[in-house]
């Protein structure tokens, strides 16, 4: 738990930066984290805001918006069962300098994965060109508890990291009988490519005496910058064909200057964040469908 204590100390000592530099660095401020969280909760009702005990609350966040949580998320298979051979992964993934992989292709579909149908909003033009949709299963699959002894359930928490200025996820798992999983069992649901890079055993920072496994991309902002670069390129190509009306969907105002510059709005940040976390936890079926962009 030494790494957990060091991480907590770093979070405590890092000063809060309220300046917005999302467009240049890919990082977000606490205010932008709240904005992105509101968007996530609106598009995916399975996610909700939570309030931490008073002693654990961060004063730079609203008392009732300390973290995001989705509960009882099913996991039917361990991460290892989603991995193909090394050659297949090498063709489908591009590793960034910080150890993150830009996309993740599953070798087979999970027929029991429960992805809720979300409210429709306009897509970012050509976003699918640079985000691998094979990591998502078809929407609307009916959830069925088949009595599988491999079934696990997870409570997932998203907090704001002051040291990295990005979201940070924590996993708390339970077996099919509701008994908490041990850390080494939760590690079985994390892709081997990331198990030693981004996963850490930590005390859940929004609760007392709860052991969790945290997943925090130390340079997640670098990943966001890559996405913004591709999105901007896609928008520029789209403008060549629709120079006067670069608007998607019905009853929408023209794209804002920020959206035109980055391609991804800051309030959509957590949807993209969850897409990448899905590469780390391929068997955990939380809501992250890219239709929300």
UniProtKB/Swiss-Prot annotation:
Question: Sorted alphabetically, which Pfam families does this protein's record hold?
Answer: Autophagy_act_C (PF03987)
* Transmembrane segment boundaries: none
Per UniProt, subcellular location reads as: Cytoplasm
Q: Region (Handle region) spans which residues?
A: 222-268
Keywords for this entry?
Answer: Autophagy, Cytoplasm, Protein transport, Transport, Ubl conjugation pathway
What does this gene product do? Answer: E2 conjugating enzyme required for the cytoplasm to vacuole transport (Cvt) and autophagy. Required for selective autophagic degradation of the nucleus (nucleophagy) as well as for mitophagy which contributes to regulate mitochondrial quantity and quality by eliminating the mitochondria to a basal level to fulfill cellular energy requirements and preventing excess ROS production. Responsible for the E2-like covalent binding of phosphatidylethanolamine to the C-terminal Gly of ATG8.
Q: What is this protein called?
A: Autophagy-related protein 3
Question: What is the species listed in this Swiss-Prot or TrEMBL entry?
Answer: Meyerozyma guilliermondii (strain ATCC 6260 / CBS 566 / DSM 6381 / JCM 1539 / NBRC 10279 / NRRL Y-324)
């Amino acid at each position: 738990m030494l790494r957990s204590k060091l991480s907590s100390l770093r979070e405590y000592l890092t000063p809060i930066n309220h300046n917005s530099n999302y467009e240049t660095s890919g990082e977000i401020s606490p205010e932008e984290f709240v904005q992105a969280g509101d968007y996530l909760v609106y598009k995916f009702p399975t996610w909700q805001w939570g309030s931490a005990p008073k002693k654990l609350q961060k004063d730079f966040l609203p008392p009732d918006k300390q973290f995001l949580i989705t509960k009882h998320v099913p996991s039917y298979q361990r991460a290892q069962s989603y991995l193909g051979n090394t050659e297949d992964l090498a063709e489908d993934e591009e590793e960034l300098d910080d150890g993150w992989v830009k996309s993740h292709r599953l070798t087979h579909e999970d027929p029991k994965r429960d992805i809720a149908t979300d409210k429709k909003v306009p897509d970012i033009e050509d976003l699918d060109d640079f985000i691998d949709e094979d990591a998502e299963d078809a929407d609307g699959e009916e959830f069925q508890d088949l009595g599988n002894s491999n079934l696990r359930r997870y409570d997932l928490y998203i907090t704001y990291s002051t040291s990295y200025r990005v979201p940070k996820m924590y996993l708390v798992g339970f077996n099919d009988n509701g008994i908490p999983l041990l850390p080494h069992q939760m590690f079985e649901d994390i892709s081997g490519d990331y198990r030693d890079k981004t996963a850490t055993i930590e005390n859940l920072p929004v609760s007392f005496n709860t052991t969790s496994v945290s997943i925090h991309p130390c340079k997640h902002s670098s990943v966001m910058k890559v996405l913004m670069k591709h999105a901007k390129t896609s928008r520029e190509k789209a403008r060549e064909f629709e120079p006067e009306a670069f608007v998607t969907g019905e009853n929408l105002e023209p794209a804002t200057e920020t959206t035109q510059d980055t391609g991804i709005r800051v309030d959509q940040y957590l949807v993209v964040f969850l897409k990448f976390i899905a590469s780390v936890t391929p068997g955990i079926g939380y809501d992250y469908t890219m239709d929300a962009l």
